[in-house]
Regions:
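Conserved short alpha-helical segments that host acidic/polar catalytic motifs at enzyme active sites
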Residues: 2-421
Length: 421
């Protein structure tokens, strides 16, 4: 395209889909073999209290690792960036009021949803499916909120493929404990995904559906995250943790839904054992059962979506094990173990011997940041092939990420710093 030719978004989307189909048919490309080399990390309030400083530090860190992401020739389309935060109740209560409802004191749940932008009928169909599944369990829907976005922060190609971005806000009974509420939402989301797919709607994706946390992400540059999502600049948007990610696609077609963080983790690296891990997961599904899923076990199969990238597949299995009742550190230990001689007599060796008998390791260069429940963690692969640095401040913040110095911290406030691995 010459400099005086106008960008045609419809033609671009069509040619992109045709190119992807040709490459898949020729065996030159498969979505399942997508890998990334990215920037990743988290910020956490050590005492668990929500703070604006956590959000500000995470935004600063994300914007500092812009060089770890790719930039399209248009100069503004990125491979993807995003941030995962706890839900700020006060922020959403004021938006619930704008729907004509008042906060009923129940568990507030929020879903961040990508809808087909150019098909109004499909949009409404998706909303109906989402509401039906939420209402089926007796929850009260406050309404939908159109997320404010500034499309001027996007490049031509990101704009051409941009979804309609909305949030569904609803209330769950306070009598539900947090774990059961999250498990219900997991099953609801999986049923929604299947129902939408059955209607042959492909441009639909739920970034997050939770009473705990919410994910803002997209196909923009890291430094544009707050420009595109002005919500993140609201001083009422506070959080006790933030997981952030800047994507660099090494062999992929960047898409909005493949931007990270995913629902549990943000991942820098690649899973070299992906095909074997996926095959083993399919085998496990045949005998998979758990009392907490009971008759709904088939709603969550297949665990790994067809065509999922390595990071998305890893996230899906992480999520399953967590929803089954395991803790986040334990799931990381099972799936991305450290190098260990399991034939030894130490308690740690016996732990890893047990883990190896339960779950095949997902191996390859990796650094992850993840959140679930009361945990936020960072970790690396057994060979330490992806970096992860951390800083603990005297004012109670823990900052971890791919590089040192992503967040400016006065030296007098550094209690401890170092590296993982």
């Amino acid at each position: 395209m010459t400099s005086n030719q106008k960008f045609d978004p419809i033609a671009y989307v069509k040619s992109r889909k045709e190119a992807e189909a040709r490459l898949i048919e020729a065996g030159a490309y498969s979505p399942e073999m997508e890998h990334d080399a990215c920037g990743v990390g988290f910020v956490a309030s050590i005492d668990g209290s929500p703070r604006r400083s956590v959000v500000d530090a995470a935004i600063e860190a994300l914007q500092s690792i812009w060089h770890r992401g790719a930039v399209d020739a248009d100069g503004m389309t990125g491979d993807g960036a995003g941030i995962h935060l706890s839900i700020p109740r006060d922020f959403f209560i004021k938006h619930i009021a704008r729907t004509g409802h008042s906060d009923d004191g129940g568990r507030l749940a929020v879903g961040m949803v990508f809808l087909p932008r150019n098909d109004i009928g499909a949009q409404e169909q998706c909303r109906c499916i989402v509401e039906q599944e939420v209402l089926r369990l007796g929850h009260f829907v406050y309404g939908w909120r159109q997320v404010p976005v500034d499309t001027g922060a996007l490049g031509d190609k990101a704009l051409a493929t941009r979804p309609e971005i909305e949030q569904i806000m609803f209330s769950m009974p306070e009598s539900l404990d947090e774990e059961e509420a999250e498990r219900q939402l997991y099953k609801i989301r999986r049923r929604i995904e299947k129902a939408v797919l059955a209607e042959l709607i492909t441009d639909f994706y739920i970034c997050s559906l939770s009473t705990r946390s919410i994910i803002y992400k997209g196909m923009f540059l890291a430094e544009q995250v707050t420009a595109f999502y002005p919500d993140l600049l609201d001083q009422q948007f506070v959080s006790n943790f933030a997981v952030y990610h800047q994507r660099y696609s090494t062999n992929t077609f960047p898409t909005w839904k493949l931007a990270q963080p995913f629902r549990i983790l943000a991942h820098n690296g690649e899973i070299n054992t992906l095909r074997g891990n996926s095959n083993w997961m399919s085998c496990h599904e045949d005998r998979m059962e758990h009392e907490v899923f009971a008759d709904s076990i088939n709603d969550i199969k297949p665990v790994i979506e067809k065509g999922a990238s390595d990071s998305a597949a890893l996230d899906s299995v992480f999520e399953l094990l967590l929803q089954g009742g395991r803790s986040l550190p334990m799931v990381k230990t099972m799936m991305i173990p450290e190098a260990m001689d399991v034939s030894g007599d130490s308690k740690l060796a016996k732990l890893y011997a047990y883990c190896n008998s339960v779950m095949e390791p997902w191996d390859g260069p990796a650094a992850i940041a993840a959140h679930f429940g009361d945990w936020v963690i960072g970790g690396t692969d057994r060979n330490g092939l992806r970096p992860m640095r951390y800083t603990h401040t005297t004012d109670g913040l823990l900052i971890a990420g791919s590089e040192t110095g992503m967040v400016h911290v006065d030296e007098t406030k550094i209690a401890e710093c170092g590296r993982l691995g």
